[in-house]
């Protein structure tokens, strides 16, 4: 009798789970690619890398936790440590770096802004004052002596004189930020600190617009697709794509490529239009059919890290984009393409 009750309960549980996942693209097992377009790079230390930027096709910088700054002169194949002219007792988390030709900016936490006019040979530390809402989170180089700074409180500032003065772009900060991204045209999207809603700032707006999340699950990250529309990563390893341009309330049904207990942290589109998703425990997946089917990447699968950012960086001289996947504890993958 007990065995019959247990069997009936299991059938009911399977039925309920099936209803809960209906409408989703879900799988528990997916194939592994026969080859990988990535190679792992050996770094000199195991601090967490957080951002990467290039001056030209060969010369670039990688920044991260514990004042991490590395420099490459061979397109990212090898990296060497650099020192910043900052007192040794001051420890910073270098969050963001960006270049336009020889002009570059780095922002870090707490309250750090560095500016270079000679392709990163020398960096000048700038004062932001004590009234800045939040900490620096994202920096974008706009033009000569001009940059835009966004903070962990959702404040956005712009300088046109090399960082001597900063003018607010928004009338009011959006509040605590979990993640924040900027599109080339100046549009921002930001996830609230708890992931229970997100906000957008269009390129001509002076105020953030609030939007509800697409489901009951908290939002991990939001970003921009190559066509300018949004993608969303939520808890439970859910992926959603923005259905209609400019309509931030219209989302696809959830795509759940792999149920392995780990969330996705970032997404990106490679030069061939394939979708990449990265997350915990070496999760690095690719879809070559707009998210309908997925494969594991063998290099990512063998890397003992949580992948937190995926970059495909445009080259100013028209060469193919550079690709990098940043993982915790000093793990970095470099795009070499399919053979």
Swiss-Prot record:
Residues 1-23 form the signal peptide. It is found in: Cellular thylakoid membrane. It is a lipid-anchor. Its main location: membrane. The keyword Thylakoid applies. A lipid is attached at residue 24 (N-palmitoyl cysteine). GO terms for cellular component: photosystem II; plasma membrane-derived thylakoid membrane; thylakoid lumen. GO terms for biological process: photosynthesis. NCBIfam families: PRK13684.1 (NF010237). Part of early PSII assembly complexes which includes D1 (psbA) and PsbI; not found in mature PSII. Binds to the lumenal side of PSII complexes. Interacts with YidC. A 7-bladed beta-propeller torus, about 55 by 55 Angstroms, with a depth of about 25 Angstroms and a central pore. This is Photosystem II assembly lipoprotein Ycf48. The lineage of its organism: Bacteria, Bacillati, Cyanobacteriota, Cyanophyceae, Synechococcales.
